[in-house]
């Protein structure tokens, strides 16, 4: 018998539509699951049990009145860098520990309009800067498959909550792999949409030319359902395009015959675990067996993506985080003068990784270094984008690893920032090019999940979702859940 916390989003939706369960019953079951496993997983920073029950009751009343909204009565979690009206939004930082937004992010407002029940806010690396959720100022989220391992980051809480059965789906954000990497490490499905597909209004910015909000869930179908709700033009975000939003769920036909899949040799990096490479190549063979045409391709500027990213992203972060000065909102530490107060506030409010990236970014933008570093990085970014454009003249989708290894032990990279940055070597090129990426579970090594990454043309999430769904129709990796101790 499937327990309520084991239901996928689409299964829960069907059960609600058929009247087999109510939203109140589903919400209570998930709150009970959170109470049972949260002491071990620690995915949530804020649990809004009272608000969730009230929303669930309202959803049941709407359904009784004939409402058929696509997410009516479905409980979801939200990464804690996305603004939620009346619910604390901390960015996992002491700087915003007590900040309560007075408005919803556009993505959250659209979820609410579609009937979703917001159950709480999820842990992440501070201001979304990290690959392990170890940079949170408040707690360490643990990988539900092995509580001594990281869940990935920065959307580690969003991934762990889905894997642990605390929520059927969540919202995460992806600046350099922060949806896809934790999805792979926690054995769930995650989608980074095309830059400009989903409004960033209400997202606390890390790197404005790279950030994107996207869904994390158990299945590709679940991600398709959520994407259709949150995608589309927004007058509050000038970078969000009016590109037509298709019916993504209708695109899940299961037929991928004739689709051309490229496998880039540069993504199989030195130091990749053999088990990871093997699982990814076996997954690609499954797609070939389903009728796809597979060929090797080259993305020659991929090796430069990591240094380019770590010039551009910190530069944008240093500008975006300048607003946290202790004057208007957030933490304020008194000082003898304005500059002393500013130094004390930012020193106490920001953790070491955030301070490191602000310093990197400020250096890259400073006089005398701008042309040598930041401007040159933007030029190489154009070459990386051009690599993808040329590749997509030959293929429809690119298939590659998501991470070079499975989840590493908590603390393994704490004293080695470069080793931590290398965890994103397979994911961050997409952000530089603004392309969509989908991760689906494709195997295990030493009891830890492995993810296959699918990369698509700009605004062609349909094809990505179609291939990912076809893969999940003939495999069962996405159906597996960890056996967690409960309290």
Swiss-Prot record:
It is an enzyme of class 6 (ligase). Keywords: ATP-binding, Ligase, Nucleotide-binding, Protein biosynthesis. The active site is at 79 (charge relay system), 154 (charge relay system), 178 (acyl-ester intermediate). One of its GO terms (cellular component) is glutamyl-tRNA(Gln) amidotransferase complex. Gene3D superfamilies: Amidase signature (AS) domain. GO terms for biological process: translation. Its EC number is 6.3.5.7. The keyword Protein biosynthesis applies. It comes from the Bacteria. The keyword Protein biosynthesis applies. It holds the Pfam family Amidase. It catalyses: L-glutamyl-tRNA(Gln) + L-glutamine + ATP + H2O = L-glutaminyl-tRNA(Gln) + L-glutamate + ADP + phosphate + H(+). InterPro entries: Amidase, Amidase_CS, Amidase_dom, AS_sf, GatA. One of its GO terms (molecular function) is glutaminyl-tRNA synthase (glutamine-hydrolyzing) activity. Allows the formation of correctly charged Gln-tRNA(Gln) through the transamidation of misacylated Glu-tRNA(Gln) in organisms which lack glutaminyl-tRNA synthetase. The reaction takes place in the presence of glutamine and ATP through an activated gamma-phospho-Glu-tRNA(Gln). Belongs to the amidase family. GatA subfamily. NCBIfam families: gatA. Heterotrimer of A, B and C subunits. This is Glutamyl-tRNA(Gln) amidotransferase subunit A. It comes from Roseiflexus sp. (strain RS-1).
